[in-house]
Amino acid sequence: TTVKDYSKLKTKYAGYLEITPDKIINIPLYQFIDNWMNTPYKWGGMDKRGIDCSALMQLLFDSVYNISIPRTSVEQFYARWIDKFRSTQHLSEGDLIFFKTIGNNVVSHVGMYLDNGRFINASSSKGVSIASINDPYWSSRLVGAGRINIELLPKRRK
């Protein structure tokens, strides 16, 4: 991939996030997002034919950060190596954001924070897409966020 390709990618996602392209630094993250963008939602899905929110997060963390996280949003929320917090003021790229969208579960949806109030997720209505935590639908369903604590992560098997 050439520098020009990165420039195009940075410009594209800077537009989605309403930030300047120079703020798009994690190229592997945005390449992953670009590869999965607009993939349809499918509950329990784990591939390009359809994917759900927690599978998207699991694949993203594995592909971009080489970090293995649990399969479901509930397991991700309760993972002991995630430092949870309620405020959205200090969100940074890579933080998981948890929502209660259905049922009696504490958590039923997960996305990953990008920048400027935007997060990547796989939603039942839009598939893999970028949404705003300030959108009334999401802000009213926000449970909290979590930052992976590298010190507490289980060691990966080779």
Predicted features and spans:
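Catalytic cysteine-centered active-site loop
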Residues: T39-E93
